[in-house]
Amino acid sequence: MSQTIDLTLDGLSCGHCVKRVKESLEQRPDVEQADVSITEAHVTGTASAEQLIETIKQAGYDASVSHPKAKPLAESSIPSEALTAVSEALPAATADDDDSQQLLLSGMSCASCVTRVQNALQSVPGVTQARVNLAERTALVMGSASPQDLVQAVEKAGYGAEAIEDDAKRRERQQETAVATMKRFRWQAIVALAVGIPVMVWGMIGDNMMVTADNRSLWLVIGLITLAVMVFAGGHFYRSAWKSLLNGAATMDTLVALGTGVAWLYSMSVNLWPQWFPMEARHLYYEASAMIIGLINLGHMLEARARQRSSKALEKLLDLTPPTARLVTDEGEKSVPLAEVQPGMLLRLTTGDRVPVDGEITQGEAWLDEAMLTGEPIPQQKGEGDSVHAGTVVQDGSVLFRASAVGSHTTLSRIIRMVRQAQSSKPEIGQLADKISAVFVPVVVVIALVSAAIWYFFGPAPQIVYTLVIATTVLIIACPCALGLATPMSIISGVGRAAEFGVLVRDADALQRASTLDTVVFDKTGTLTEGKPQVVAVKTFADFDEAQALRLAAALEQGSSHPLARAILDKASDMQLPQVNGFRTLRGLGVSGEAEGHALLLGNQALLNDQQVDTKAIEADISAQASQGATPVLLAVDGKAVALLAVRDPLRSDSVAALQRLHKAGYRLVMLTGDNPTTANAIAKEAGIDEVIAGVLPDGKAEAIKRLQSEGRQVAMVGDGINDAPALAQADVGIAMGGGSDVAIETAAITLMRHSLMGVADALAISRATLRNMKQNLLGAFIYNSIGIPVAAGILWPFTGTLLNPVVAGAAMALSSITVVSNANRLLRFKPKE
């Protein structure tokens, strides 16, 4: 079965290098297509990643596997100490390897603007990727381009931009901009409605809005007042539309400018030269221009206020860092600004303090609340040698700790960076909406012109009036803004809410894939279980001494890195171990060596059988231990089986409850393990697993995932080790447990900040809720436009004899955007079912 593998390339410097790599890959019979750039390759075929990397190396370049579904958000990993789930739940990043830049944008009004700004940024030399977020009015740009070049590109496209250095400044400027924007929209709405409402009411109860010789001067004054309203309260619509026209584009502002402008120009023409129009066509529409501008500005104000609420989760994370830290020196303690704290400084924490930076405790004990980082509500006890993390709170106790990571290098900063990048990404469904939005405005203008022409040539008299009403109403009611906001608003709210539950999503596409899963595969060791195996029994045969058996087994395991080795060494921690010679690791079987003149074998039954050691006499004991969920580790001395060490890795305390939640949600649960089937089935029965794939060697995990996918299943893989990375990459969605290896986390689409399977259930529940919300928004926006535009074009006239008022169209347009934003904000209150 063909697959697409994403590779990160190194050593390429020009087009010739790209061509050489592409030709080398496509010469392989198992490669169907290779898309190569200077930095990456996307290869489709049946070849494995290892084979492709070897081919690239033979061509003279280097390559490594990157995330198959999305570009990794952190380009490098700096291994951290395995002290807490938090510290390892993110790949560390330095200021040098973070090539992303943030821009605050202004002047954008709909998805057409997004496409235009994104294309402008991606055309700048040095830009590898640009993500524009309409909901937050921001752009996240990857690459080596300078901030000045990026700002100039945006301004050339007709919009405003400001380069932002860090999250603190971004937040400050974004809040300033949001407050200023809301104030501006508010007074513009008040001014426009203050003129529009009285004129409309007067027209309804005191005048029929038809110009006559008696009221002509009064209407001329009203027309000039309306023009002033259009300039001062609606000028931004016309300026934006003009800039778009100069750049050969059309946006929502174009529709508003055309609709209100045509209505005013027609009314002023009737006002100045009434003799040119038949008596029945001398109707004025000044109030429509003022009311439409007022209602749309009011809608923008309410939308901006609702958008601010959508970033609530991320703002909570930003609020976690205190402004100062308590520095301990030889002269005593003093409070210093957070920006002055450097790695290596000694800091103090007492009850109630919020931790300012990451570090390691050197003295004292304390209970820390890490809920905002990990979603874990139970305070954690910390002592000397343990890690503490910026943003957590000391509930009780006092400690001294040495700063290890400050500023943008703290776990909290990396979480914020990951969340923000995920919020700026777009799923496939969102990209489809963007494509539609890109042609939406020109199509609406064409529909308005065609509808107006039909009414002009075939409509009732006075044709010019009906033509004007139809064209204006169609232009005003169409709402690309709702379409453009539908996806990003749901993503911002969903990703932010997930972060509150300790679930970090790499990108929006991962959320979409996670919402369609039907099978969840768990690695056993360290995922379903605690990852801390214990020797629960030692049974000897042929009168062999139990202590001697344990001593020899531990001696062999000194050279092994297997998790079971640690359990045996812990059991023999107080014993004097002999020197081992000729140590060998037999992959998937065990270890061998010589000690005190004896040939030793330690491993599974397959190892002893492979070395012609008879195990028939002890098969009953092996089966008995395996049926209880223990892993039988056999020791053979000089060709004879002399001992059985039963090693058991207990299930996590919340594994059963979490798996029950997943069962109720309709997922099929699969356990992937290298254990023998008897042991694996015993553990699966205890945990409530549906299917067991046992006896899988480390390099066979990805193949096991492939087999499940070939059955038509949508598969998530949950793991934490380096050997899980290929399976995490192969799965439709890889989920890395907090505390897992950096390689696993870098490969996974979703990272859990707490080492709990409840996080898996939470992640999948939030993914489903987010996609459901996204579909509701998109469906609502499509239905609104699909019904609104035909109604505005007069489709109901033959049946009801009525047309939609342009003012009602303006109100409906504003309401559609507010509805989308409000619906997305419901995700901020979402709680996964227990």
Swiss-Prot record:
Stretches of the chain forming a coiled coil according to its record: none
Active-site residues per Swiss-Prot or TrEMBL entry: 523 (4-aspartylphosphate intermediate)
The keyword Nucleotide-binding belongs to this UniProt entry's keyword annotation: yes
HMA domain ranges (all copies): 3-64, 99-162
NCBIfam families cross-referenced by the UniProt entry: ATPase-IB1_Cu, ATPase-IB_hvy, ATPase_P-type, PRK10671.1
Binding site for Mg(2+): 720, 724
UniProt cross-references to InterPro entries, sorted A to Z: ATPase_P-typ_cyto_dom_N (IPR023299), ATPase_P-typ_P_site (IPR018303), ATPase_P-typ_TM_dom_sf (IPR023298), ATPase_P-typ_transduc_dom_A_sf (IPR008250), HAD-like_sf (IPR036412), HAD_sf (IPR023214), Heavy-metal-associated_CS (IPR017969), HMA_dom (IPR006121)
Gene Ontology biological-process entries: copper ion homeostasis; viral translational frameshifting
Reaction(s) catalysed (UniProt annotation): Cu(+)(in) + ATP + H2O = Cu(+)(out) + ADP + phosphate + H(+)
Keywords: ATP-binding, Cell inner membrane, Cell membrane, Copper, Copper transport, Cytoplasm, Ion transport, Magnesium, Membrane, Metal-binding, Nucleotide-binding, Phosphoprotein, Repeat, Translocase, Transmembrane, Transmembrane helix, Transport
Organism of this sequence: Escherichia coli O157:H7
EC numbers, comma separated: 7.2.2.8
CC annotations in GO: cytoplasm; plasma membrane
Positions that bind Cu(+) 1: 14, 17
Protein's UniProt name: Copper-exporting P-type ATPase
Transmembrane segments: 187-207, 218-238, 254-274, 284-304, 438-458, 464-484, 779-799, 801-821
UniProt record similarity statement: Belongs to the cation transport ATPase (P-type) (TC 3.A.3) family. Type IB subfamily.
Binding site residues for Cu(+) 2: 110, 113
GO molecular function annotations of the record: ATP binding; ATP hydrolysis activity; copper ion binding; P-type divalent copper transporter activity; P-type monovalent copper transporter activity
Record carries keyword Ion transport: yes
